[in-house]
Amino acid sequence: MFLTRRLLGPFTSAIARKLEHYSQFQPSSLTIQQYLDFGQTGTMKSSFLFLKNELLVRLANIMQEISLLPPTLLKMPSRRLVSNWYCESFEDLLQFEHAQVEPDIMSKFNDQLQTILKRHSRVVETMAEGLIELRESEGVDIASERGIQYFLDRFYINRISIRMLQNQHLVVFGVVLPESPRHIGCIDPGCDVESVVHDAYENARFLCERYYLTAPGMKLEMHNSVNPGMPISIVAVPSHLYHIMFELFKNSMRATVENHGADEDLPPIKVMVVRGAEDLSIKISDRGGGVSRTILDRLFTYMYSTAPPPPRDGTQPPLAGYGYGLPLSRLYARYFHGDMYLVSMEGYGTDAMIFLKAIPVEASEVLPIYSTSSRRQLTMSPQAADWSHQLPNHGNRNL
């Protein structure tokens, strides 16, 4: 109960007990096929009955982990604001815990989901500002940084999963319109991969040209080994794939322009898309000069960025800044059991590799579970060195 009090503060003991209760349950990992099937054959009633419990479980699991963060981070104003949002949302959902399945109740539930989505819209930026506040005020020791990295991977993939549940329900059973008539909620049963790649490239190019007045071109090669000669499509959440590609294109463009100079003929970014029997594989290759192995190990950490922090007044969307682009993109890839990693040759360029499950029944949610193991990871003291020098951790490959 002490951990709960650290998080909830002034909230009632009854709500604290509910938090303890729901954190004892494991979240239900769904496959993208289950999302798709339910979107086609499910009912608003059954979705309501599932969500009103599952959202409480997913919130409670991650809220317990928030309470285990280092005390120096817990007291940062931006971090406290995020916790308040989560506590408010947990309390809002509790009102439906024993609610009757009636049209007006389900309508109010939909309204509440939209309120929660809006409330949490700036969670990523606000948590990032909390880390900046911590760095500027007290600094971060190695042990705390490892715990924060472990937590944030779990926190953000939990956030992705909660928003997926909410958006899927609101598009299928609410008033939110799908992006395309073909979509089942947020899912496209025949996601045109080439189209998503082009959209991400064009938008990243627009941003690059806005900052540098130039941008590298793209050479795209598609290879469908399952249906040779046919366009590549999979069951996917297009917005997730777009997010990954857009962030990687931004990084490649920035590196290419800064390495070669805006006045030179820029080498193109090469993209290879391959549809295999089990995986959709995408490789993005640039000649942006690459990075050393020392830096490569840091690129997926939330406490590191190769660019200065963005302005806090929100006046201009930065091409780079918080340093969250790569770690969040990797989480979007891993959310449905895919992966993403980088291979870099210092002095030449970088390859980004993306793997997504092409078989929807195998594309299952990867969700954090609050447990003894997670508590130990978040609170353990630094270990005594057992090597004379630190070995490369290849952190861009391990979750």
Curated annotation (Swiss-Prot):
Keywords: ATP-binding, Kinase, Mitochondrion, Nucleotide-binding, Transferase, Transit peptide. GO terms for cellular component: mitochondrial matrix. ATP binds at residues 247-254, 286, 305-306, 321-326. The keyword Lyase does not apply. PROSITE patterns: HIS_KIN. It catalyses: L-seryl-[pyruvate dehydrogenase E1 alpha subunit] + ATP = O-phospho-L-seryl-[pyruvate dehydrogenase E1 alpha subunit] + ADP + H(+). InterPro entries: AK/P_DHK_N_sf (IPR036784), BCDHK/PDK_N (IPR018955), BCKD/PDK (IPR039028), HATPase_C_sf (IPR036890), His_kinase_dom (IPR005467). Transmembrane segments: none annotated. Its main location: mitochondrion. Pfam families: BCDHK_Adom3 (PF10436), HATPase_c (PF02518). GO terms for molecular function: ATP binding; pyruvate dehydrogenase (acetyl-transferring) kinase activity. It is an enzyme of class 2 (transferase). GO terms for biological process: regulation of glucose metabolic process. It is found in: Mitochondrion matrix. PANTHER family: [PYRUVATE DEHYDROGENASE (ACETYL-TRANSFERRING)] KINASE, MITOCHONDRIAL (PTHR11947:SF3), PYRUVATE DEHYDROGENASE KINASE (PTHR11947). Inhibits the mitochondrial pyruvate dehydrogenase complex by phosphorylation of the E1 alpha subunit, thus contributing to the regulation of glucose metabolism. This is [Pyruvate dehydrogenase (acetyl-transferring)] kinase, mitochondrial.
